[in-house]
Amino acid sequence: MISRVTISTIYNCTLERAFKTPILCDVSKVHTGFGIMPKVTHCTEDENWGKPGFSKKVYAAKSLTQKGGFASVDHVIERVENKYWKFQVNEFQAWMLGFHKFEAEWETTEIEPNKILIRYSYALHSNQPLFYPLNWLFAKTFWKTYMKRVLENVRQMAYNNELYLYD
C-alpha cells in the first residue's frame, strides 16, 4: 500500500535558495524531531550527496522508536536544477509500522522573483496488510504534521542563507 501526502507553501526567497536548502544544507536542522520522530544528528558516507544515484547514511538521536545511531539511508533519485528533487529513504534500522521505504519530492516553481511555490510530497510504502489502516492514519495525521514542521525549518534556513554543505 502507498499512502500519499502533499503539502505546499510559498517561500519569499530566491529560487536557488528554495531549491537547494532542504537537500544540500545540514539535515540535522531540517529534521529536528517531533513526537515519536527522533532528531537527525548527522550523516556519513555523504561525499557525493546531492547528485542523482548517490546516497548517505542518516543517524538519529535516541527516542521511543529508535535506539539512536544509524537510522536509515537517503538516496537522490532525480535532480532537475531549481525545479525538482526526488529522493528515497529506506534501509530503516528500526521497525516503522510496516513501512519499508518513503519516496519524497520537493518541487519549486517561481511565481515571481523571490516568491517561490513549494510542493512537498511523500509516498509512504508499506507491505504488511495488517497495518494498512494504521499506515494510512499515520500518513494523513502525524506525517503530514511532521512535514509542515520540516517546511517551516527549511523556510527559516532559506531566509537565513544557511550554508550549503554539498554541491
Where do the PLM segments sit?
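Hydrophobic ligand-binding cavity/cleft-lining segments
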Residues: 1-51
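Beta-strand residues in well-ordered beta-sheet regions across diverse protein folds
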Residues: 19, 88, 119-121
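A conserved amphipathic terminal alpha-helix motif
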Residues: 123-167
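Short, solvent-exposed aromatic-acidic interface loops
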Residues: 90-95, 121-127
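A short, structured loop/turn motif at beta-sheet edges
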Residues: 12-16, 77-84, 107-117, 162-163
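Amphipathic hydrophobic-ligand
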Residues: 1, 98-103
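Hydrophobic/aromatic beta-strand elements that line small-molecule binding cavities or substrate pockets
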Residues: 7-9, 71-78, 102-110, 122
